[in-house]
């Protein structure tokens, strides 16, 4: 890419491509500079440094994931929406492994405040509207869904299931079905360890 065509967007796109091809750990200022055909110093005209570069790629991945989830869940509700939501995450993780790695980074304040992050959060909460989860429990339910999906995908990525012959697709479907049942029977009140009646 000629230097004249460089922009913040082009640099971030290059970082995301590099992450998918070589892994998120391969993304450095020097490697991205090589990717776009300039010297590392030229990149600093467009990004403040490595952290800003990774943040940009993180936000890019959030935006792409949000778009994929929105398309998948459009017009669906309840279990159908949940399955589409989960499958969209799995497809993105499979199709963009490096970008998925970037999504597992601890989000910076600017990433958390981005419209892309807000959209992912809104889509998650919208998916939960098809279940009888009380308003004050929706954040907990969203964390539960996220932990289940991300945990399964992380284990798959690390070949944790490779030693068994049972198909991972069947395990995935069972996990999503279990999520559906848990959300459908989410209790109206939660008992926390600090509650007096639960400390006997």
Predicted feature residues:
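Hydrophobic alpha-helical connector segments
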Residues: 70-101, 118-121, 135, 141-145
């Amino acid at each position: 890419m000629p230097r004249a065509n460089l922009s913040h967007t082009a640099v971030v796109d290059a970082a995301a491509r590099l992450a998918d091809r070589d892994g998120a750990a391969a993304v450095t200022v020097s490697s991205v500079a090589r990717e776009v055909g300039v010297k590392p110093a030229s990149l600093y005209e467009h990004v403040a440094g490595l952290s800003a570069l990774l943040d940009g790629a993180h936000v890019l991945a959030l935006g792409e994931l949000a778009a994929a989830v929105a398309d998948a869940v459009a017009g669906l509700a309840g279990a159908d929406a949940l399955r589409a939501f989960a499958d969209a995450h799995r497809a993105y993780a499979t199709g963009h492994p490096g970008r998925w790695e970037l999504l597992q980074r601890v989000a910076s304040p600017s990433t958390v405040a981005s419209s892309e992050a807000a959209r992912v959060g809104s889509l998650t909460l919208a998916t939960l509207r098809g279940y009888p989860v009380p308003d004050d429990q929706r954040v907990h339910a969203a964390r539960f869904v996220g932990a289940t999906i991300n945990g399964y995908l992380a284990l798959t990525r690390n070949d944790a299931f490779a030693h068994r012959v049972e198909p991972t697709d069947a395990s995935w479907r069972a996990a999503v079905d279990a999520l559906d049942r848990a959300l459908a029977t989410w209790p109206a009140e939660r008992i926390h360890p600090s509650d007096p009646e639960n400390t006997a």
